[in-house]
């Protein structure tokens, strides 16, 4: 684009409040931190040596993997395959939540009417087979990921993109259905793979039939040694095309990144202590306090740290499947939540390490507080016919608090009494040894999980529910089986974590939108179907300023919390990690927004002793 064109676009943005953008990057809101000629990100060591290895366990509850295709619903792909083997047009940073810089695309140009964006591909970009990354590959990837053969979340994420047009060998245009400041970022997040991936005699297989075909991506790593279902190693591509790019300088320094799979937390932790792998993130406060101890920690062989971060909090809770008749009445869901004594759990089990999750955007500016503000009311009033009056007149619901003070009105007995009143209003009364509805059906609840770690929480919760006449069955199954049941919504209550975002947007359609409630494999596991929620999500994704986004998300949070779709859990403001001493070095500056596993594998590097050991192994 000419200098005059850039100046004109900047002037238009200034006058009309358009999203800020520049050829080398795009910012949804505000300014772009790094200029076009920047050398490297501040939080990396540009001179980090290459070599050595790091071995980890996946931060999820993955217990197996059976495919190399991370883009389809059936089966489980290895951890980090998408981020290490495949790449996107733009790449985000760990210090700017709503800005992305050119990776496969060397520049992005937003149309003056903001209804399309053109990405120009970097002529250096190459797939692992040596082929250039071309516009036709970008279109192919988009078409495949929005087809019925792909996992449903991709059709939701890219639902506001009407299509992709190849303009030239290295230029591709994404066409948008409406003006939406997030859409260039969404387009830029498209994973790109070669048209040749899955080809058989020049004919492409449907995406869902590409299972164990070796991926043809452009990322810094290729698949190395694999023990299917148990462990996988990624080998650094020494001829990686972007190794000298500013957005990759100082990144991906290990020659090998390996992941090991263990069946449960106990086996995993014991293996870590025995030296089977290098790095682990802890999620259970009791384990962190009592199990991450011993001779190896005392001697300094193993290091445990609590790392500060600026991430938005994750929403974690026991999620109700509101497709089940027993959970359709909000009073039943609210009553069940009253039976969980978080304060007791925090004292007795969690070493007072947690704060209570309050809303769906915990720990961020997007969390609703008090009564609706004037800005929220302006959003809620047009939806009055869909909402209960208390949304407008009462403070946003808070998770129940259990007090030890008998005069507080909030003892466990008080909460259970309130729960019983709600259940009675909903038609559930105690008779014949159980809580029953007018048809005589007993209220029984199955808590489904893939690990028994939550059992110590469910047990006291179940005892309180039994006082109301509700019987609880806590069932632990393999993660792969659990995932299959979640995909078809075959559950009653699950413990689940909804990952937070510094700028929530289109992903909310799949998490809370009515359409996603009926799509197998979608993230709306709670089955939320609410016209007000749909309307507010639509407002969120069309926000043109950060202030608009804040008010719209607060209104959405308020409506969701009045729906009592989950029993909120707890969260921590730190990352708990442990790793082997003397094997790694880290940049001097820690970024603000990061996940520990990605931070370690992306920008840490091997220590001299690690490099020396690796050199001996190679010889």
Ranges and model annotations:
Residues 8, 120, 155-201, 218-227, ...:
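Surface-exposed binding/hinge segments that line
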Residues 23-112, 140-143, 216:
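N-terminal lobe/hinge region of extracytoplasmic solute-binding protein
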Residues 25, 58-60, 80, 227-232, ...:
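Detector for C-terminal structural segments
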Residues 44-49, 72-80, 107-151, 167, ...:
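Aromatic- and charge-enriched surface segment that lines or borders ligand/interaction sites
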Residues 75, 81-96, 188-251, 255-258, ...:
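Gly/Pro-rich hinge or "lid" segments in bacterial periplasmic/extracellular proteins
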Residues 102-106, 128, 133, 175-195, ...:
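Aromatic-rich, solvent-exposed beta-strand/loop patch
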Residues 122, 209, 242-292, 334, ...:
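Ligand-site clamp/hinge motif
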Residues 163-166, 224-235, 260-324, 331-335, ...:
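Extracellular/periplasmic solute-recognition and catalytic clefts
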């Amino acid at each position: 684009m000419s200098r005059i064109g850039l100046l004109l676009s900047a002037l238009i943005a200034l006058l009309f409040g358009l999203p800020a953008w520049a050829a080398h990057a795009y910012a949804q809101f505000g300014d772009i931190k790094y200029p076009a000629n920047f050398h490297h990100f501040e939080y990396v060591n540009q001179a980090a040596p290459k070599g050595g290895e790091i071995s980890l366990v996946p931060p999820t509850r993955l217990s197996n993997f059976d495919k190399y295709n991370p883009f389809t619903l059936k089966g489980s792909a290895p951890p980090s395959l998408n981020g290490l083997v495949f790449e996107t047009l733009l790449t985000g940073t760990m210090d700017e939540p709503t800005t992305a810089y050119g990776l496969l695309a060397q520049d992005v140009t937003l149309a003056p009417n903001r209804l399309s964006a053109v990405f120009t591909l970097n002529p250096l970009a190459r797939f692992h087979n040596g082929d250039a990354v071309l516009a036709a590959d970008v279109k192919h990837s988009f078409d495949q990921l929005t087809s019925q053969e792909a996992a449903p979340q991709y059709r939701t994420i890219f639902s506001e993109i009407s299509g992709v047009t190849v303009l030239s060998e290295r230029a591709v245009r994404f066409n948008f259905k409406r003006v939406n400041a997030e859409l260039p970022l969404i387009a830029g997040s498209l994973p790109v793979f070669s048209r040749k991936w899955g080809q058989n005699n020049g004919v492409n297989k449907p995406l869902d039939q590409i299972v164990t075909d070796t991926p043809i991506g452009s990322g810094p790593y290729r698949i190395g040694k694999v023990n299917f279902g148990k462990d996988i190693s990624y080998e650094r591509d020494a001829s990686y095309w972007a190794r000298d790019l500013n957005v990759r300088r100082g990144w991906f320094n290990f020659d090998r990144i390996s992941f090991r799979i263990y069946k449960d937390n106990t086996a995993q932790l014991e293996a870590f202590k025995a030296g089977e792998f290098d790095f682990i993130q802890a999620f259970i406060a009791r384990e962190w306090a009592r199990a991450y101890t011993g001779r190896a920690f005392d001697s300094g062989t193993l290091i445990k740290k609590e790392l500060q971060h600026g991430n938005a909090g994750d929403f974690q809770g026991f999620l109700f499947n509101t497709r089940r008749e027993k959970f359709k009445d909000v009073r039943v869901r609210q009553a069940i939540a009253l039976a969980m004594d978080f304060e007791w759990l925090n004292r007795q089990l969690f070493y007072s390490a947690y704060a209570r999750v309050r809303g769906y955007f915990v720990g961020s500016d997007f969390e609703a507080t008090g009564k609706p503000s004037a800005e929220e009311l302006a959003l809620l009033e047009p939806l009055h016919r869909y909402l209960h009056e208390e949304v407008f007149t009462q403070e946003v619901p808070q998770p129940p608090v259990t007090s030890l003070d008998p005069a507080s009105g909030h003892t466990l007995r008080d909460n259970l009494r309130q729960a019983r009143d709600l259940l009675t209003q909903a038609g559930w009364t105690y008779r014949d040894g159980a809580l029953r509805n007018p048809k005589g059906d007993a209220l029984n609840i199955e808590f489904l999980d893939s690990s028994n770690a939550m059992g110590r929480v469910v047990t006291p919760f179940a005892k309180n529910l039994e006082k109301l006449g509700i019987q609880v069955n806590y069932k632990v199954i393999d993660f792969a089986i659990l995932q299959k049941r979640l995909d078809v919504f075959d559950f009653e209550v699950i413990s689940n974590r909804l990952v937070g975002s510094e700028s929530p947007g289109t992903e909310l359609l799949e998490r809370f939108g009515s359409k996603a409630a009926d799509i197998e494999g979608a993230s709306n596991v709670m089955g939320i179907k609410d016209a007000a929620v749909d309307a507010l999500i639509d407002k969120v994704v069309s926000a043109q300023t950060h202030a608009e986004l804040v008010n719209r998300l607060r209104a959405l949070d308020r409506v969701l919390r009045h729906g009592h779709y989950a029993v909120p859990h707890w969260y921590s403001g730190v990352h708990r990690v442990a790793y082997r001493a003397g094997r790694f070095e880290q940049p001097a500056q820690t970024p603000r927004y990061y996940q520990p596993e990605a931070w370690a594998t992306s920008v840490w590097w091997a220590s001299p002793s690690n490099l020396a050991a690796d050199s001996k192994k190679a010889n």
